[in-house]
Amino acid sequence: MDFSNKIGFLGVYFNKFTIKSLVALILGFRGRYITVVTPNVDHIVRLNSNLDFKKLYQQADITVNDSRILNLLSKIAHVDIGDVIPGSDLTRKLIENLPCNDYPISVIGASDETIKFVSDKYNLTYLHHYNPPMGFIDDAIEVNKCIDFVLNNPSKIIFICVGSPRQEI
């Protein structure tokens, strides 16, 4: 699938999706994997001052705008970067539209309480969770634990919820 149709704004190239079309694409995707990022204004500032961070965003298959402020700026500049799709809204819509409650999902980050709440609310039976300790990104052993967790828990969706910029690295 070709996701190369992107619109550049402030050094980032955005795909234009509605939340409905993006959820359908993700849940219907049959390829190996796709990477979706949802930058907000803080991310834009950071990636324009950090080349390594910017490369990570450039490598993402799909980039959608997470920020109403960014949306307003794009309108002022007469650049249509698509709908505002906050990562939290996308996550909720994905879970609400899962084809079955045993759809394999993995989550890195978030508290045990949050995972239990989501699992109970949506009756998810195949939800794997690992919450690395604070500062894990500077500890090769902990980073490898995250990688091993993903490899040992095959899932159709993997949510990385450890905060920027750690989740991008």
Model-derived features: positions:
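Periplasmic-binding protein-like
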Residues: 156-162
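Loop/helix-junction capping segments adjacent to catalytic residues or to phosphate/diphosphate-binding pockets
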Residues: 47, 137-140, 165-168
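Short acidic/histidine-rich motifs immediately flanking catalytic phosphotransfer sites
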Residues: 66, 153-156
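N-terminal nucleotide/polyanion-binding subdomain common to many enzyme families
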Residues: 1-91
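Structural motif
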Residues: 39-42, 108-112, 163
